Every structure is written in structure tokens, then in C-alpha cells.
Amino acid sequence: MSLSRQSCGRVVRVTGRASARGLIFVIQVYRHMLSPLRPASCRFVPTCSQYAVDALTEYGLLRGSWLTMIRLAKCGPWHRGGWDPIPEGLTTGRSCQTDVDGANDDWNPASKRGERESFV
């Protein structure tokens, strides 16, 4: 079976998301049965459990688990907390690159477009 360039890794992402459902179920059990027994102490918005559900839903089992582990590593007195949503727009690999010959100017620095870098 050969995948066309149009599928662009979607089979892998769908499989990862489907396998993440079991872990999301475990997180939901924690959120609804164990978490209410403890006082609210999460220093992040969204909470770490909501972050995990969002990351697993958006990025699948492997990348979502990795993002969740990074977030949980921040949980402690050494981090001030605050607003920390899941990152948007993570690429899935070079095979899915749609920008050809610098057609996307959003990522080209001003100096490469012949513009000044600052107005001052």
C-alpha cells in the first residue's frame, strides 16, 4: 500500500489520536473521581489535566504524551505558572512541507525580502 503525497502522514496521526483515547479516558477518571478529593492547586491555565487532554486530542499519543510530560515537568515551585496553552502549528515532518521556493513570506526574514528589519 503506497500513500499519496496528499495523505501526508494523516494515517499516522489518525492512528495516534485513536490510541490516545484510552489515555484520555484515564485522565477523565482522574479528573472526575480523584481530583475533587484534593484542594485545587494547579498553577497553570488550562490545568495540567486539561492540557493533557487537549495535547492528546490535537497531536495524538506520542507527541501529545511528550508535550504533557514537558508540562508536568514545569509543575513545581521553580515555575511561576500562568497561561500555557498547547503549542499551535507543530509540523509533522518535512514530507508535508507545502511551501515551495519561499512562497510563504510569513517565515522569511525582512532582510531576505529586501526590507529593513526595524523602523528606528
From Swiss-Prot:
What domain of life?
Bacteria
Q: Name one Pfam family in it.
A: YidD
Coiled coil (UniProt feature)? none
GO cellular component entries: plasma membrane
Compartments, record wording: Cell membrane
Where does the protein principally reside? membrane
Q: Which InterPro entries match?
A: Membr_insert_effic_factor_YidD
Which UniProt keyword terms apply here? Cell membrane, Membrane
Membrane topology of this protein: Peripheral membrane protein
Annotated region (Disordered), positions in chain: 93-120
What the record says about family reads: Belongs to the UPF0161 family.
UniProt function note: Could be involved in insertion of integral membrane proteins into the membrane.
- Protein name (record): Putative membrane protein insertion efficiency factor
Where does this protein come from, organism-wise?
A: Mycobacterium tuberculosis (strain ATCC 25177 / H37Ra)
